[in-house]
């Protein structure tokens, strides 16, 4: 049986977070009717929520931010639902299954960005912005150039993420459900468009909340059954896992999947700052009523995600013990059926039988839908709010802006389906690494410095932001993943897998240098306006009305 090549998570954690990208050849599985029935129940229920939400979406604020009426707890669950992808579940547990302790290190890597969001970004972002993070970046800077840069940064991240999600969705569904790849991609695209088109942020939020609850329940049940098997003793769990794993005691120590310190540092910075620059995550902070609820959102989201990653660690060791040692889950060559990414799915069957296997498969599909819905809404708002209403057609009515947003949703949906089909047999795992690098090198520096550095000017933000974005793209192309593995050259021009360390440095240095040397009258005026922005960012004065651009 052909192996499913794991997502980049099998060796590199960027994809474990977000790609859901199972790249390579997939042998279609028999149709899993339990999974299909459970998934249909989920779809019918969420379409009902979309219909309910569509009756409550009456304005631009309702469509983009659910009217700002989501509570901190609900938003925390939704953020967790937006951030915990199917490959977080499958990829991290697969990494633990193959490498043990390394999987825990990487799962913690996905959490380190959240304290930055909590302490540095959440409160000021909510007090200064209205619908998108470009509202914050352009608060005292020149609207046109900054919004174009922010929208481009957002759209590139969204596009790369969407392609990775769509290809991963098709491969995953082909594997779990036995459905044809093209049918799976079209199904995800159509459902994604329906959620966002009719229900906006309100429907997207509730799809993400439901998915988060289902995923946390499923993972909790699996972890509980694993611990029950070993008498609720971690000592027994680790001892039994070491006894059956080919690496033996080596799974309890770091194995050095990232070989050199530069790559490790670059990877860590990309994960940490990339999270704080993802447009679909930042957009969620505008769905709550005030800065206090925004802080609570991050607090709850971090708690849910931390709990989830602890569960994946237990699930990974449970898979070593109950799946790795069971010949029923191996093919003729002795490899795991479906590849290592399927370790958690096989464990679901081992601890809960066919019915629970169907449930976990349906949850994996629901997870992809929740993530792509959030991405699509972020992309649509960048086009309609940042570009159309504030650059190309200033003074556009709410109705016109919403019309453009919905057209963008349709266009993004169709493009995502087409690219999902075209990239079926391509290695798309690098796209998520590139998305994170761009978010960390373009979006994050501009957001952070616009809120904290009084001497920032439009010239500095523009030149530094574009330099960061282009450096990330160029270094990724010249690196080992694209230059050698995809383009087929013998040796990479840029030797490191991850460009974040270098591209983030270029962005911050560029922003600092071009702002510090900007002696124009406009630059001086922008510096003087920082005090008013600072007061607004601290007090939230005027936040209910938002800033009229």
UniProtKB/Swiss-Prot annotation:
Predominant place of localization: membrane
Q: Please provide the record's keywords in A-Z order.
A: Cell inner membrane, Cell membrane, Ion transport, Membrane, Sodium, Sodium transport, Symport, Transmembrane, Transmembrane helix, Transport
Query: Do you know which InterPro entries this protein is assigned to?
Result: Cation/Ac_symporter_ActP, Na/Glc_symporter_sf, Na/solute_symporter, Na/solute_symporter_CS, Sodium:Solute_Symporter
**Where is the chain membrane-spanning?**
33-55, 76-98, 103-125, 146-168, 183-205, 212-234, 261-283, 303-325, 359-381, 402-424, 428-450, 462-484, 494-516
- List residues in topological domain: Cytoplasmic: 56-75, 126-145, 206-211, 284-302, 382-401, 451-461, 517-549
Q: How does it sit in the membrane?
A: Multi-pass membrane protein
| Keyword Ion transport among record annotations | yes
**Chain's role:** Transports acetate.
Q: Extract one GO BP annotation from the record.
A: plasma membrane acetate transport
Q: What is this protein called?
A: Cation/acetate symporter ActP
A GO molecular-function annotation: acetate transmembrane transporter activity
Which protein family is it in? Belongs to the sodium:solute symporter (SSF) (TC 2.A.21) family.
Q: Which organism is it from?
A: Salmonella typhimurium (strain LT2 / SGSC1412 / ATCC 700720)
